[in-house]
C-alpha cells in the first residue's frame, strides 16, 4: 500500500539520520532550492518555502535547531536518542555557558578601561570635594555674614573642639557604613520609612507648639462682658414687670461699646512672627525631668522668651502647656550674670538659667534646686541667620573672658583624655558613684577638698594651677561649693548634643513608664554593639 502525505516528502528509514548532530553553523538558513535538489517530490505535492522560517530575537541561540542539522533517532538504538560517540547539543552548549560566567576566566581589563576607570574615580573625588567646599562656603557666608569678635577670638578653641569631635563622628560614620553592609535591604527600607515618619512627627509637633504660642499671646478681640449694660438693664427692669417666660436681657441684647474688657498688649501676628524657635532639655540628675520635651521661642521685638512643654498621653492625646511664661529674663550665673538674654546667647549647646522660685508652676522636683538650667539641643538656623542679619548686636569684653574659660577647660580635658582612653566608662561611672557618697546633704554640692580627693582616688591628677583656674570659673558665686555634675562636665567634657539626643531617645524607649530610671539589666538586653566597626575589628 502506498501512503501519500501531503506537504512532506516521505523518505526511507535508512536515509534518516540521528536527531542531535550539528554539521552546519547556526546561522545557516534553508532555501527551497536546496530542498528540491536533495528530495524530489511528486508534482501534486506543493513546495514548502522554508526560507520564511526565521528565529525571533527573544529566543536563545541554542534553542534553535535547523531541520537540516536535526537528525532523528537512529533505528538501530531503541534505548536512547543519542549514539555513544555523540554529545547532546544542549548539554554541550550549557557547559560552555557555565564556563563563560566563571569570574576567574574573565579576561583582564585593558589599559584603556583602566584609564577610564581612573579618570572617572578622579572626577568623582574632585566633584565631591568641590561640593563640600561650596557647602562650607555657603554655610560660612550665611552664618558669619559679619564675623563677630566672639568668632575671631575663640577660633582656636573652636578648631580644637572640632578636632576633638571629629573622631567621634568618624566612628559613627564607620558604624553606619558597617550597618548598611550588615543589614538586609528590607531592614534598610523599613528603617528609612520609620525615619521619615519620625521627621514628619517632629515637624508636626513643632507646628502644634508654634500655633499654641500664637493663640496664647495674640491680642484677642473683645467679645462680651457678663457685666456689660448693667445700668441699662436695671433701668429697663424698673419699668417692665418680671416674667418667667421672657428671656433675660443679657441674652437678648449684647453690645460691645460699653464693655469693661481691655486687652493687656498690642501684639499682632506680624510682630510675633519675628521669633527664634529652639529645642531644649533640662540639665538634671532626675531622669524624668531630663526627658521633658521643651520647645522655646525668643522674640526679637522685646527680647523676651517663653518655653513650652509638649506632653503626649498614649498614642493620640497630646497637650501643650507653658513651662516658662513669656517675659524678659536675665542670666543667673556665669560671666553674664544679671545681663539680659539677647540673640547671641542662643546657639546649640548654650545653657539658659532661671530662678526656680520665680516660676510657681514648675514641678516640685525642679523647685528643689535653686537654678533651673536648660540646654539648647537644636535651633532654627535659617531663622537665626535672618534675625542676625536684621539686628546689629555689639559684643562686649565678656566674650574674651568666656573664651579664656573654655581654653582652660580644654587644656584640662586634653590632659585627662589619655587617662580616660582605655578605661573611660569605668572611671565615669565610678566617679559618679563616689560623688554621690560624698554628697551627704543630697543637694549635689561639694567643696574643693572633696573634688581633690575624688581626683586622687581615680588617678586623675591635674596641676595645681589648672585646678585653681577651673575652680575659680566654676565657683562663680563664691560660696565655696560647686555642683559635682558641673565639675565633671567641665574637667572631663561631655557628649555633643547631636549624639545625646539619641541617648535620650533610647532612654525614653526603655523608660516606657516615665519613671525616670531604667534598670541596668534592661539596658544590657537592648544594647548591642556587635555591628560597630571597632567591635568587628576587635
UniProtKB/Swiss-Prot annotation:
Compositional bias of kind Polar residues: 134-146
PROSITE patterns: EF_HAND_2 (PS50222)
CDD domains: EFh (cd00051)
One Pfam family from the record: EF-hand_7
All copies of domain EF-hand, residue ranges: 426-461, 462-497, 498-533
Binding of Ca(2+) 3, residues: 511, 513, 515, 517, 522
Record flagged with keyword Calcium: yes
InterPro entries: Ca-bind_SignalingProt (IPR051581), EF-hand-dom_pair (IPR011992), EF_hand_dom (IPR002048)
Positions of Ca(2+) 2 binding: 477, 479, 481, 486
SMART domains referenced in this protein's UniProt entry, alphabetically: EFh
GO molecular function: calcium ion binding
Residue ranges, annotated region (Disordered): 134-154
Keywords: Calcium, Metal-binding, Repeat
Tissues of expression: Abundantly expressed in many tissues. Expressed in brain, colon, heart, kidney, liver, lung, liver, pancreas, placenta, skeletal muscle, testis and thymus. Highest expression in colon, testis, lung, placenta and brain.
List of residues binding Ca(2+) 1: 439, 443, 450
Name of this chain's protein: Calcyphosin-2
Organism classification: Eukaryota, Metazoa, Chordata, Craniata, Vertebrata
Gene: CAPS2
Amino acid at each position: 500500500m502506498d501512503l501519500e502525505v501531503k506537504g512532506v516528502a516521505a523518505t526511507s528509514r535508512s536515509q534518516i539520520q540521528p536527531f542531535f548532530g550539528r554539521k552546519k553553523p547556526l546561522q545557516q538558513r534553508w532555501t527551497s532550492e536546496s530542498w528540491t535538489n536533495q528530495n524530489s517530490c511528486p508534482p501534486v505535492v506543493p513546495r514548502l518555502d522554508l526560507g520564511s522560517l526565521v528565529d525571533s530575537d527573544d529566543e536563545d541561540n541554542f534553542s534553535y535547531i535547523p531541520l537540516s542539522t536535526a537528525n532523528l533517532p537512529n533505528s538501530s538504538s531503541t534505548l536512547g536518542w543519542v549514539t555513544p560517540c555523540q554529545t547532546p547539543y544542549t548539554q554541550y552548549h550549557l557547559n560552555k555557558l557555565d564556563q563563560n560566567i566563571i569570574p576567574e576566566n574573565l579576561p583582564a581589563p585593558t589599559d584603556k578601561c583602566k584609564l577610564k576607570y581612573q579618570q572617572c574615580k578622579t572626577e568623582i573625588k574632585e566633584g565631591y570635594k568641590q561640593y563640600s567646599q561650596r557647602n562650607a562656603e555657603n554655610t560660612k557666608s550665611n552664618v558669619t555674614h559679619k564675623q563677630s569678635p566672639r568668632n575671631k577670638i575663640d577660633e582656636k578653641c573652636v578648631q580644637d573642639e572640632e578636632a576633638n569631635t571629629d573622631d567621634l563622628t568618624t566612628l559613627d560614620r564607620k558604624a553606619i557604613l558597617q550597618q548598611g553592609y550588615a543589614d538586609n535591604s528590607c531592614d534598610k527600607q523599613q528603617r528609612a520609612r520609620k525615619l521619615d515618619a519620625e521627621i514628619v512627627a517632629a515637624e508636626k509637633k513643632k507646628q502644634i507648639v508654634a500655633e499654641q504660642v500664637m493663640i496664647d499671646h495674640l491680642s484677642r478681640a473683645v467679645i462680651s462682658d457678663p457685666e456689660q449694660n448693667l445700668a441699662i438693664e436695671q433701668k429697663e427692669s424698673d419699668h417692665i414687670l418680671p416674667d418667667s417666660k421672657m428671656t433675660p436681657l443679657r441674652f437678648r441684647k449684647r453690645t460691645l461699646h460699653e464693655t469693661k474688657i481691655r486687652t493687656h498688649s498690642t501684639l499682632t501676628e506680624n510682630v510675633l512672627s519675628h521669633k527664634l524657635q529652639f529645642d531644649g532639655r533640662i540639665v538634671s540628675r532626675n531622669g524624668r525631668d531630663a526627658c521633658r520635651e521643651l520647645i522655646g521661642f525668643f522674640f526679637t521685638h522685646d527680647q523676651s522668651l517663653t518655653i513650652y512643654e509638649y506632653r503626649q498621653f498614649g498614642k493620640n492625646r497630646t497637650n501643650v502647656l507653658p513651662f516658662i511664661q513669656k517675659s524678659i529674663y536675665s542670666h543667673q550665673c556665669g560671666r553674664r550674670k544679671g545681663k539680659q538674654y539677647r540673640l547671641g546667647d542662643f546657639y546649640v549647646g548654650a545653657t539658659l538659667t532661671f530662678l526656680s522660685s520665680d516660676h510657681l508652676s514648675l514641678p516640685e522636683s525642679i523647685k528643689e534646686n535653686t537654678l533651673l538650667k536648660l540646654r539648647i539641643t537644636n535651633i532654627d538656623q535659617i531663622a537665626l541667620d535672618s534675625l542676625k542679619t536684621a539686628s546689629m548686636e555689639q559684643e562686649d569684653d565678656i566674650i574674651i573672658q568666656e573664651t579664656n574659660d573654655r581654653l582652660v577647660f580644654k587644656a584640662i580635658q586634653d590632659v585627662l583624655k589619655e587617662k580616660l582612653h582605655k578605661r573611660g566608662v569605668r572611671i565615669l561611672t565610678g566617679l559618679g558613684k563616689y560623688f554621690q557618697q560624698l554628697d551627704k546633704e543630697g543637694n549635689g554640692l561639694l567643696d574643693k577638698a572633696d573634688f581633690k580627693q575624688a581626683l586622687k582616688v581615680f588617678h586623675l591628677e591635674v596641676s595645681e594651677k589648672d585646678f585653681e583656674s577651673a575652680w575659680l570659673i566654676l565657683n562663680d558665686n563664691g560660696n565655696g561649693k560647686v555642683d559635682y555634675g558641673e565639675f565633671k562636665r567641665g574637667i572631663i567634657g561631655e557628649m555633643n548634643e547631636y549624639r545625646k539626643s539619641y541617648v535620650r531617645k533610647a532612654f525614653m524607649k526603655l523608660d516606657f513608664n516615665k519613671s525616670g530610671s531604667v534598670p541596668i539589666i534592661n539596658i544590657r538586653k537592648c544594647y548591642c554593639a556587635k555591628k560597630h566597626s571597632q567591635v568587628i575589628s576587635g
